Swiss-Prot record:
GO cellular component term, pick one: membrane
Keywords in alphabetical order: Heme, Iron, Membrane, Metal-binding, Monooxygenase, Oxidoreductase, Transmembrane, Transmembrane helix
Family, similarity comment: Belongs to the cytochrome P450 family.
Chief localization: membrane
Listed Gene3D superfamilies: Cytochrome P450 (1.10.630.10)
Protein name: Beta-amyrin 28-monooxygenase
Native source species: Kalopanax septemlobus (Castor aralia)
Catalytic activity entry: beta-amyrin + 3 reduced [NADPH--hemoprotein reductase] + 3 O2 = oleanolate + 3 oxidized [NADPH--hemoprotein reductase] + 4 H2O + 4 H(+)
EC number: 1.14.14.126
Gene Ontology molecular function, alphabetical: beta-amyrin 28-monooxygenase activity; heme binding; iron ion binding; oxidoreductase activity, acting on paired donors, with incorporation or reduction of molecular oxygen, reduced flavin or flavoprotein as one donor, and incorporation of one atom of oxygen
Uppermost EC category: oxidoreductase
Compartments it resides in: Membrane
Lineage of producing organism: Eukaryota, Viridiplantae, Streptophyta, Embryophyta, Tracheophyta
Amino acid sequence: MQLFYVPLLSLFVLFVSLSFYFLFYKSKSGSTSGLPLPPGKTGWPVIGESFEFLSTGWKGYPEKFIFDRLAKYSSNVFKTSLFGQPAAAFCGAACNKFLFSNENKLVQAWWPDSVNKVFPSSTQTSSKEEAIKMRKLLPNFLKPEALQRYVGVMDQIATKHFKSGWENKKEVLVFPLAKNYTFWIACKVFVSVEEPTQVAKLLEPFNAIASGIISVPIDLPGTPFNSAIKSSKIVRDKLMGIIKQRKTDLGEGKASPTQDILSHMLLTSDENGKFMTEGDIADKILGLLIGGHDTASSACTFVVKFLAELPEIYEGVYKEQMEIAKSKKAGELLNWEDIQKMKYSWNVACEVLRLAPPLQGAFREALTDFSYNGFSIPKGWKLYWSANSTHRNSEVFPEPLKFDPSRFEGAGPPPYSFVPFGGGPRMCPGKEYARLEILVFMHHVVKRFKWEKVIPDEKIVVNPMPIPAKGLPVRLFPHKA
């Protein structure tokens, strides 16, 4: 669908005044330090190299945009233009360390305008400002004692999920099921919604949001971007209904002040004694639900893919998980101690995250002029770090395309080289939460089934996460009792 709009947008660009291009780049792209700008090109006026950046992902090779330019310019920093902004790509562990270490000093988080349009704030603040506020609210729900409580909740939901979606099926589509699993957990943990029909009503528009949040920003009927904007409003309206009902339930003593993040938001004031409005809370819950299931659903899907392709790896995971399963009494839930025993399984999951990182990279914005590696970076430039620049680098990970969980034994990879969750102050606060979801999923799927891929050479597309083009259909072989 996105490729259909490439010629449409290109025709539009032909009518954009070139004077804007020269004004924009002459005023914002020049070096003021005497040092040269990084090597590279800025592509077409206004749209820059955005189509090349996005289309390599649509074709299943997101790393190609990065590695082609690294080879061409022989530099770990190169200039480009993405989403209408002058930009520089920072590639490699040293670059990651520099960006992550200078958060809120030389650089700050930045999202394309499309993100703010899909997630408009009721308070007219940016997605970046909302994210900062959200990080202040999350620690109580992501600290170890809280995470320990979630293991049993995730185990219960996983049992229901596999019973309804996998058992007594000859074939299943893994990616939609993985999204259902992680979204079900997010709904339960964040807003105490767990009834399957309610979860399904929220999940459908969320799928449209995920497909359009980082897309060609054409707000016309039928485009992914337009669908994402409409779906965001639908979800927000549904959340407003949930929030209003919770306020009533709290007032009548029918809900607990500590049962989930929603209750906490309703009852917690800021440093000035001001409470969040219902609209504020809906905005934040919307962002949490997106972040709380997308990363893990992609990871769970690729766990199934790689275990189907690598029977020796499957056997290692199966052995570890069955030892845990056999130690449990009938009906006994998984607990924190069980999770800590899943060492090989987590090494496997980490290797999956290395080869198919859900977070392909992220943007920063230069807060001031600065220099790096002999190049000038002007204030306002957007800076993109890429997970694949280290994950698939043979100098960091020998034989980078080989699946090898032993890379994560002992001390593991060098610092700043394995970055599926980002790094520094902006490292995903839900990293440990996602780890629990993934490991609970692995426990349930391998103790029930072996499987094989229905489409051996199924294409992978990245938009913005890696996704099997056909949803990863697999043929199930239940274990004999």
